[in-house]
Amino acid sequence: MRFAAGLLIFVMGSLLFAVIAIFVASEMSGEVVRMRSFDANGRHEETRLWAVDYGDHTYLRGRPASGWYRRVVLVPEVELERGGEVQRFRVVPSKHLREPINELMSEKYGLGDQLIAVIRDMNEVVPLRLDSLGP
């Protein structure tokens, strides 16, 4: 009984440590942008994400199972706050660019990206190109 309780405490502590490590890695690894996505009723939610530039566009990446990803697929117009400026964009899923975008994310965010790759299948993430809608 004591062994089971100790094992449970160890597992729960390890999970908590992993969650905290991923949060710290995601927030401290470099630039974090704020994206406001909207539902069909116009209500917005803000999500903090990593961003990279590739060619003439900014890219985000996400998992199709995440809530913010589902919102931007249904309502692709978003607002992105980056470097103190807010701009409007249309989100365009760009699966064909998974490899170069993942490489850029890894270069830019280093250890933080590696930690996240441990718990996520990076073959599932979808790069999202941001097309400017103007001011």
Spans of features found by a protein language model:
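Short beta-strand segments
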Residues: 30-64, 78-82, 88-92
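Short linear motifs in intrinsically disordered
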Residues: 21-27, 66-72
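Terminal leader/tail segments of proteins
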Residues: 15, 24-32, 36, 129-132
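Short helix-to-loop capping/linker segments positioned immediately adjacent to catalytic or ligand/cofactor-binding
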Residues: 21-24, 37, 115-117
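Hydrophobic membrane-insertion alpha-helices, especially the h-region
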Residues: 5-23
